[in-house]
From Swiss-Prot:
It holds the Pfam family NDK. This is Nucleoside diphosphate kinase. The gene is ndk. One of its GO terms (cellular component) is cytoplasm. Major role in the synthesis of nucleoside triphosphates other than ATP. The ATP gamma phosphate is transferred to the NDP beta phosphate via a ping-pong mechanism, using a phosphorylated active-site intermediate. GO terms for molecular function: ATP binding; metal ion binding; nucleoside diphosphate kinase activity.
């Protein structure tokens, strides 16, 4: 099974969209294997966005992602990276298709609700910034209902 890192950014948290977004992933059949509510540090943000460090918008990215709490999670499933990217929609919310997370909840590129790893290499770079291996929980869906 493939895994991907997803960050629900400060605007998703502030707008109370976390539950709705997680529900979409679960309904699609993706499994949460790690999740935490956290405040990203500047150092974590700089490491996370290091591929953009020489771009003019780098400091804005760092300041925005550290402006409030986020939800970090690892989702697991067949083709998880590709599926989550499709579900997320275009990076610029004003260009994202309706029915995608950004298409439904974002109006622009700056506050665009969600980050999702765009490749296995990106996941391998990003995951250790937010999770240790012992925070990833291996589990299986059960068919029985437990009360």
């Amino acid at each position: 099974m493939d895994r991907t890192l997803v960050l629900l950014k400060p605007d998703a948290v502030k707008r109370r969209l976390v539950g709705k977004i997680i529900e979409r992933f679960e309904e699609k059949g993706l499994k949460i294997v790690a999740m935490k509510f956290m405040q990203m540090t500047k150092d974590q943000a700089k490491t996370h966005y290091s591929v953009h460090q020489n771009k003019p918008f780098f400091n804005d990215l760092v300041n925005y992602i550290t402006s409030g709490p986020i939800v970090a999670m690892i989702l697991e499933g067949a083709h998880a990276i590709e599926i989550v990217r499709l579900m997320s929609g275009a990076t610029d919310g004003s260009k994202a298709q309706p029915g995608t997370i950004r298409g439904d909840y974002s109006m622009g590129i700056e506050k665009n609700i969600i980050h999702a790893s765009d490749s296995l290499e990106a996941y391998n770079h990003e995951m250790p910034i937010f999770f240790s291996d012992n925070e990833i929980i291996e589990w299986a869906y059960g068919d029985e209902v437990i009360y």
